[in-house]
Amino acid sequence: MALPFQKELEKYKNIDEDELLGKLSEEELKQLENVLDDLDPESAMLPAGFRQKDQTQKAATGPFDREHLLMYLEKEALEQKDREDFVPFTGEKKGRVFIPKEKPIETRKEEKVTLDPELEEALASASDTELYDLAAVLGVHNLLNNPKFDEETANNKGGKGPVRNVVKGEKVKPVFEEPPNPTNVEISLQQMKANDPSLQEVNLNNIKNIPIPTLREFAKALETNTHVKKFSLAATRSNDPVAIAFADMLKVNKTLTSLNIESNFITGTGILALVEALKENDTLTEIKIDNQRQQLGTAVEMEIAQMLEENSRILKFGYQFTKQGPRTRVAAAITKNNDLVRKKRVEADRR
């Protein structure tokens, strides 16, 4: 089922992009480059040969045709003759011929084991099934599948077939891939802007084709929304501008209690903006920022630890610290905040 915005994009399929770009001025082209940098900061959607920007503004000194150059190089390579060997190869072998040493054959000596008379009598009178069970308990699994042992047991039983005591393994349960996120981005954004009371949780996880401006609109809509309590945008290719937009939202929003921005492209700059915003927020109790594309660094982790020590409302903080100092401080701060909530709950129950 095609989404509404996908239907609108169909009318742009037959547009000549080269003609449109040729009509743009230099200033308009620079503005377009800035917009593309915001949409794709890592240039992951471009081929590897086009990710490097121009390093100079100088005009070309002569015409350059890449296809013509490749054809010329290929033609020159085919026309040039191979260089003849000055010293022909005669096949003469020099030096000693490597002969591997023969390893001595190891012979195993059987150790004689003497058992108690009671054990020998018990083993002599044991049935084949009991011997199989004993071999399984002792871990002698090669004995269970040994054909010689099967022949001996069959002969001892008067020509009957061997006893099979094979443990069958459990069937492997198939693991199916998770279905795509069914959240409709446009409808959710419209509901948030309209402050729909039925929308209390928004889940945009793993939707990788959401434009950066649309994610900013979500943050802008949360500034005035009074019903959404949980918002999650993990693995949506969000970057620092998105994190800064959500930081501005946290300074104003008084309803949101949980925010998840894990597995994105946010650097220390965006995380520091969120940390500063949490100092002015009184409602958020859970935030997850782990698994970003690059490590945040010691300075950012120390700022996070200081913020959590001063914030008594955050009960869950999703981040794996790389340094022992900030990790210990954050663990103590989170434990203290949860103890305060527990004490308030106990006092309320007593009343």
From Swiss-Prot:
GO MF annotations in UniProt: actin binding; tropomyosin binding
Alphabetical GO biological process terms: actin filament organization; learning or memory; muscle contraction; myofibril assembly; nervous system development; neuron-neuron synaptic transmission; pointed-end actin filament capping; positive regulation of G protein-coupled receptor signaling pathway
Swiss-Prot/TrEMBL keywords: Actin-binding, Cytoplasm, Cytoskeleton, Phosphoprotein
Tissue expression as described in the entry: Neuronal-tissue specific.
Protein location: Cytoplasm, Cytoskeleton
One matching Pfam family: Tropomodulin
Principal location listed in the UniProt entry: cytoplasm
UniProt keyword Acyltransferase, yes or no: no
GO cellular component: cytoskeleton; myofibril; striated muscle thin filament; synapse
Subunit structure: Binds to the N-terminus of tropomyosin and to actin.
Function per UniProt: Blocks the elongation and depolymerization of the actin filaments at the pointed end. The Tmod/TM complex contributes to the formation of the short actin protofilament, which in turn defines the geometry of the membrane skeleton.
Protein's UniProt name: Tropomodulin-2
Lineage: Eukaryota, Metazoa, Chordata, Craniata, Vertebrata
